[in-house]
């Protein structure tokens, strides 16, 4: 079934910034997709086209990206009469029309919006759920429900506190189902709220962009201590482990790292990559930390390689790899990390996201599907993580509707699968291992 009409518009993301939404019509109905947007973005990401017209939305409008869809992409796809199940063909067509390495002509936000809508239409065309259509596109015969990684304490560029490291996450790996993982996550979250309130006062429980708390602490160890306490109070010490997203590129300063980067600059306090690595190792020793994302700057390749070889935990590349096949291939050959963070808007199409995932998995890596800090009510990544069988997803705390929208969709999928539902649990790093 071919595309009858495509219409794009500017809508608002969870931070009040404009983003792209696409309505795609086939004979089967309307299929709608919205594009997310990040705060701490890797410099190697595909280009998110913003208007840069300072008189409108502080320069963050996306009317050009919308216009590229309505005036160029839409007429081309409608006239070509391609069947919506042909995801790769349609994505390729848009990428060729754009003609740039990083999608800077149309904007990755334009191409991705259409790509996501096409994928949703393709599922209905085939008469299968979206996660099953994605599994088919990826060549996966089975599907797996992921362990959620809840970002419950925020720092870095996501928060107004002094904390340098961006995310402290809880992963309920000991749960027996996704529904149970949600319950554990929610209960630990509420216990954490009380722990923070008792220690720092009620105003310390205000939430950040992703629904986590942002108490005004400076020491990263203090965040881990708060998590350890909340997990114990909730009664889940044996079932919950901790993950971190350091986003170290945000505080990289000419070969060193500044763990107090939100204070006035003082080079005397910078630490070396080796000192930072030792700090991480102390975290792993003293807390149930099993996963660290972006521990070093996106170009500090040597530090990544050294750490991954010796840490014995999951080391996740986000700014390092930006869901880009070339960066993933380099990181794989240099053994820089052992897990890919998959963000559809870093690469800008469904097909390339699937390819990035496959490439990472073929190198023996784990893959964690991720939201962005500027999100919408779109739930595509919930179906994506199930269809790709990656076993892990991070899409915020169990708080704020744009985060819960994804988690709730995974709950529905688990219910629909019934007795066939398989939860990744403790095998979240490699759920397909027999």
From Swiss-Prot:
It is found in: Cytoplasm; Cell membrane. PROSITE patterns: ENOLASE (PS00164). Disulfide bonds: none annotated. One of its GO terms (biological process) is cellular response to interleukin-7. The modification N-acetylserine is found at residue 2. It catalyses: (2R)-2-phosphoglycerate = phosphoenolpyruvate + H2O. Mg(2+) 2 binds at residues 245, 293, 318. GO terms for cellular component: cell surface; cytosol; myelin sheath; phosphopyruvate hydratase complex; plasma membrane. Keywords: Acetylation, Cell membrane, Cytoplasm, Glycolysis, Hydroxylation, Isopeptide bond, Lyase, Magnesium, Membrane, Metal-binding, Phosphoprotein, Ubl conjugation. ISGylated. The keyword Transport does not apply. The modification N6-succinyllysine is found at residues 60, 89, 228, 420. Binds two Mg(2+) per subunit. Required for catalysis and for stabilizing the dimer. Testis. Found in the principal piece of sperm tail (at protein level). The alpha/alpha homodimer is expressed in embryo and in most adult tissues. The alpha/beta heterodimer and the beta/beta homodimer are found in striated muscle, and the alpha/gamma heterodimer and the gamma/gamma homodimer in neurons. In striated muscle, expression of ENO1 appears to be independent of fiber type. GO terms for molecular function: magnesium ion binding; phosphopyruvate hydratase activity; RNA binding. Substrate binds at residues 158, 167, 293, 318, 370-373, 394. The modification N6-acetyllysine is found at residues 60, 71, 89, 92, 126, 193, 199, 202, 228, 233, 256, 281, 335, 343, 406, 420. Its cofactor is Mg(2+). Pfam families: Enolase_C (PF00113), Enolase_N (PF03952). There is a cross-link at residue 202 (Glycyl lysine isopeptide (Lys-Gly) (interchain with G-Cter in SUMO2)). Pathway: Carbohydrate degradation; glycolysis; pyruvate from D-glyceraldehyde 3-phosphate: step 4/5. Belongs to the enolase family. Glycolytic enzyme the catalyzes the conversion of 2-phosphoglycerate to phosphoenolpyruvate. In addition to glycolysis, involved in various processes such as growth control, hypoxia tolerance and allergic responses. May also function in the intravascular and pericellular fibrinolytic system due to its ability to serve as a receptor and activator of plasminogen on the cell surface of several cell-types such as leukocytes and neurons. Stimulates immunoglobulin production. This is Alpha-enolase. It comes from Mus musculus.
